[in-house]
């Protein structure tokens, strides 16, 4: 199994992606295809000792800038590192792609080249989120791929989130909830009410609505929402952690007693930081396309990208897309009903 690594995407230099790829080969035994400026990549690889049978370099001549239009990148840069990486998956030479490049371009390229899994209308980005319990994390989706979602799309997000939780979190029967303004049935706008009804009829372990304040309380394993709300929820969570960390740092400096207290509490504070650190997961998968695509922060460091490659390896090995296909097949009647609600002909 080979993982294609987009070496030219992201805010950091190519050296970061190359080192991450080499570390992943050493630590996880995975095969990698590093895509980008071949001469520069080969020059960087000379610094490392690694199994050369597990590292391949594929040249690309174009780079998609972080602020570039996804449509422009898709139309005009057919030899970009992200396009070549995705093409490798399409050709069967790689099973997954890891990129810290332009998120919009990565999504557009994956959707255009790989196409959606049969029965899935819209791919979605899923994020692994922490909870108040050390050993519990949950899936939040969509966190940015789709801003205007009909009940059909939200229902399919739930199917994909359930499959992802089974695959990556190794859960047998994930608890699925719909993010809403209240827990009671009948809350929210019409699309959410209709989505609630669809989820009740599904094979999923649907536990109802969940409010934002309860997302971190270890009550659910999959939280479903549209990409607009999901992205806000994700960014608020990240911002809240930064806020708490800044307040703690400021208060620690106020007196010698505070500094002494910090020394006594240093280990718990380090655990808090680790549990809220996205670098342990590495990246977020674009669920619903015919291939594994892991999207990383543009500022990702070596450790983060290394873990993203591991993430991609696990999803590919565990046949994530096959599990999504099974979820779809088990809920065809509900999907058919959702399409009728959507005004589509069956």
Give the label of every model feature segment.
Residues 13-16, 28-33, 38-42, 147-212, ...:
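Glycine-rich phosphate/diphosphate-binding loop of Rossmann-like nucleotide-binding domains
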């Amino acid at each position: 199994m080979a993982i294609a690594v987009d070496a030219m995407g992201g805010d950091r230099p190519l050296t970061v992606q190359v080192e991450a790829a080499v570390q992943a080969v050493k630590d996880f035994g995975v095969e990698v295809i590093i895509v980008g400026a071949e001469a520069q990549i080969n020059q960087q690889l000379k610094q490392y000792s690694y199994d050369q049978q597990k590292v391949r370099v594929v040249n690309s001549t174009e780079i998609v800038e972080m602020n570039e239009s996804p449509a422009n990148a898709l139309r005009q840069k057919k030899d970009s590192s992200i396009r070549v990486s995705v093409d490798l998956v399409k050709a069967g030479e790689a099973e997954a792609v890891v990129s810290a490049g332009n998120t919009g371009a990565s999504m557009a390229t994956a959707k255009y080249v790989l196409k959606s899994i049969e029965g899935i209308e819209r791919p979605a980005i899923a994020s692994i989120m922490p909870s108040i319990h050390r050993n519990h994390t949950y899936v939040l989706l969509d966190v940015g791929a789709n801003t205007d979602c009909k009940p059909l799309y939200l229902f399919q997000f739930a199917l994909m989130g359930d499959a992802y939780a089974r695959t990556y979190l190794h859960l047998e029967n994930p608890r699925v909830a719909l993010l809403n303004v209240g827990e009671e049935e009948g809350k929210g706008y019409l699309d959410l009410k209709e989505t609630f009804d669809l989820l009740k009829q599904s094979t999923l372990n649907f536990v109802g609505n969940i409010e934002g304040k309860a997302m971190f309380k270890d009550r659910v394993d999959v939280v479903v929402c549209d990409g607009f709300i999901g992205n806000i929820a994700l960014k608020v969570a990240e911002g809240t952690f930064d806020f708490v960390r800044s307040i703690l740092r400021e208060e620690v400096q106020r007196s010698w007693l505070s500094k002494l207290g910090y020394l006594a509490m240093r280990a718990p504070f380090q655990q808090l930081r680790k549990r809220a650190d996205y670098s342990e997961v590495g990246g977020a998968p674009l669920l619903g396309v015919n291939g594994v695509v892991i999207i990383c922060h543009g500022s990702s460091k070596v450790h983060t990208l290394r873990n993203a490659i591991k993430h991609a390896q696990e999803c590919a090995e565990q046949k994530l897309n096959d599990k999504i296909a099974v979820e779809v097949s088990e809920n065809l009647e509900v999907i058919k009903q959702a399409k009728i609600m959507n005004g589509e002909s069956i």
